[in-house]
Design a protein with these regions (language model features):
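Conserved Rossmann-fold NAD(P)-dependent oxidoreductase catalytic core, especially the SDR/UDP-sugar
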Residues: 82-120
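Mid/C-terminal beta-alpha module of Rossmann-like enzyme folds, strongest
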Residues: 11, 15, 195-243, 279-281
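Conserved C-terminal active-site "lid" loop/helix of NAD(P)H-dependent oxidoreductases
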Residues: 219-225, 238-281
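NAD(P)-dependent short-chain dehydrogenase/reductase
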Residues: 134-187
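Glycine-rich NAD(P)-binding loop of the Rossmann-fold in SDR/ketoreductase-type enzymes
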Residues: 37, 68, 72-83, 119, ...
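A recurrent short beta-strand within the Rossmann-like NAD(P)-dependent oxidoreductase core
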Residues: 150, 179-180, 184, 199, ...
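NAD(P)H-binding glycine-rich loop region in Rossmannoid oxidoreductase-like domains
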Residues: 36-76
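N-terminal Rossmann NAD(P)H-binding glycine-rich loop of SDR-like oxidoreductase domains
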Residues: 3-20
Length: 281
């Protein structure tokens, strides 16, 4: 199988290349290509590679930046996925793309949220990710969108790293500064390696939208405390009162044979894989 990957130098894409070595023929867009490319340039590149699957991981995912720069967000998060879809349609490739749990921002419903929920995202990033889903599926009904949660990894293997829950907690502990979390903020958080493991079978999913990540029945206050305890560190947590529910119901993916650990199980696995099961003590 020939797979063309966008965002291959990013947090997830670099780990896809690392974990999938030898599993398929992996091709990437040149670094910086998508930042300047128009639709015709993308189409020509896809035609040259002739992939079986386009795995579109590239995005502009800084929600604050997207809020302040909506045109940049629209190009990266709506236009480019649509151009990918048209190129896939013309070449006969399957398109599998990341969406985000941020499409659920603004949801009033409690508990795990299904893919069928009527949505009205409260931030620009979530609005654009939802629009991309809708517009791409109109052009390419067999495209697959995976709504992923906040992901994390620990530094290692010379792979790029970015801010995430365990690293944020570690920095706060080292600096002696408090971190803020709400007892009314609910979301799953996933170990990126598990996401990438499940991403390979997801290439064969029927077209549509799928929630794709770990469950979590704990608030972010409880989750942060659990992560800190597993790390063996002491962190001061300031409890705030703002409300958000991004918890995703994973039953649709589970019905296709794709399952995830809970948020807490996933972090315990992460520590085992880095030989840190006893924490950092």
């Amino acid at each position: 199988m020939k797979i063309l990957i966008s965002g291959s130098s990013g947090f997830v894409g670099s780990r896809v290349l690392h974990q999938w070595q030898g599993r398929a023929e992996l091709f990437t867009f040149p670094r910086g290509f998508l930042a300047a490319a128009d639709e015709s340039a993308i189409r020509r590149f896809v035609e040259t590679v002739q992939p079986d699957v386009i795995l579109h991981l590239a995005a502009l995912s800084d929600t604050g930046y997207c809020q302040q720069h909506p045109e940049d967000s629209r190009r990266a998060n709506v236009d480019v996925p649509l151009w990918m879809a048209r190129a896939a349609a013309e070449t006969g490739a399957k398109l599998v793309a990341f969406s985000s749990d941020q499409v659920y921002s603004g949801a009033a419903q409690e508990g795990p949220l299904p893919e069928t929920l009527s949505l009205s995202p409260s931030n620009i990033y979530g609005q654009h990710k939802l629009e991309a889903e809708q517009r791409v599926l109109e052009v390419l009904p067999d495209a697959v969108f995976l709504r992923v949660p906040w992901m994390y990894d620990l530094p290692g293997y010379q792979l790029p790293i970015r801010g995430n829950l365990p690293l944020n907690l570690l920095r706060a502990a080292l600096r002696g500064t408090p971190v803020q979390f709400s007892a009314h903020d609910w979301r799953g958080i996933s170990f990126v390696r598990e996401v990438i493991e499940n991403l390979y079978p997801a290439l064969s999913l029927p077209g549509g939208v799928y929630n794709f990540g770990s469950s979590n029945d704990r608030s972010m206050v409880e989750t942060a405390r659990q992560f800190a305890e597993l790390l063996g560190i002491s962190v001061a947590i300031e409890i705030t009162d703002w409300h958000r529910n991004l918890r995703m119901d994973g039953c649709k993916a589970t019905a296709q044979g794709i399952t995830f650990c809970s948020t807490q199980e996933g972090f315990a696995r992460c520590l085992r894989e880095y030989n840190l099961s006893g924490g950092l003590r």
